[in-house]
Amino acid sequence: MLKPMNLTCNGVHSLSPSTKRNVMKVLMFGWEFPPHILGGLGTASYGITKGLSLQPDVHITFCLPKPWGDEDKSFMNIIGMSETPVVWRDVDYDYVKQRLGDRMSPELYYQLRDNIYADFNYRLTDDLGCIEFSGRYPDNLQDEINNYSIVAGVIARQQEYDIIHAHDWLTYPAGIHAKNVSGKPLVIHVHATDFDRSRGNVNPTVYSIEKDGMDHADCIMCVSELTRRTVIEHYHQDPAKCIAMHNAVYPLSDEVKQMVAQRKPHTERKERVVTFLGRITMQKGPEYFVEAASLVLQRTRNVRFCMAGSGDMLNAMIEMAAQKGIADRFFFPGFMKGKQVYEVFRDSDVYVMPSVSEPFGISPLEAMQCG
């Protein structure tokens, strides 16, 4: 988890709840949240919201592209962009309740509807006047980012809040829109930059969105000092408004501890297991894992390799293992979440992280918890 702190960036330090108000209300924009996560962003979002919620003077409203209804709402409010109207629709209460289910109350729907832009017209809306979101990272991701920002304007007009917090580049335009609407300070949370994701082959569109978010931010939270230096040097930001806020993990539950303790001793294992766990993308260096596996298997066959995760390089890695004649020594279980992560670590002898750039990986911390 992330431990809460009083931010001291320009324009933000004056909002310390202990000195100005009884409760600090945070409007937070995110892209994923447990149990429906696609990577570390969802895990980190849970950690910071859960940690902040432990403070009696912090109240959080968390915005998601597409909630599924089974998210933990016990410690904060969740607003779905896919349930927020941007175009007026004359619909009755019972129909709204039936359509939205547990994802949003009809009362909130009508309150949000009262704050749409009167002159706004958007043809890609449903019968409730809402825009559809995939809740993932689709091929038309840029369209979803733009639509997310449109919806953020409605939410920013309706909600009461003291500060805006935007997670990663996907939500920076939304954070900027909310700041322009409200005049409230904007904190952006840099979980990674495109310099990390692209091995230096930066996408100019992504870079532009990232820099725009940083330029408009009153405070820039970076997950490591490495990321902070990248933000300062490559995005030309004022060091005074950039702080390092490291990720962390929660202690293992008793249930997971018992599961991890069931690990077989080395003497009872016929083969050693070496594991890669993470997004199978350029940033994480999965091809180096396969290359290293090939070298190891030239010396011994008493090893199996697990590449757990999903990503745009998964098929290429499966093909690479086959081309090197080591496919019989490889296991590709797909994306792991929840207890599955700890089951993989429990059954592993070595965890390898061949990332080309790693702002602050959560998986290594989870691996360390398993001994």
Residue ranges and their predicted role:
Residues 335-336, 343-348:
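Short alpha-helical donor nucleotide-sugar binding micro-motif in glycosyltransferases
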Residues 21, 58-156:
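A conserved catalytic-core segment of Leloir-type glycosyltransferases
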Residues 316-336:
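Nucleotide-activated donor-binding/catalytic signature segment of Leloir-type glycosyltransferases, i.e.
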Residues 226, 248:
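Carbohydrate-associated surface elements
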Residues 361-364:
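Short glycine/serine-rich donor-binding loops of glycosyltransferases
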Residues 266-293:
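Conserved donor-binding/catalytic core segment of Leloir-type glycosyltransferases
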Residues 356:
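Aromatic "clamp/platform" in nucleotide-sugar-dependent glycosyltransferases that forms part
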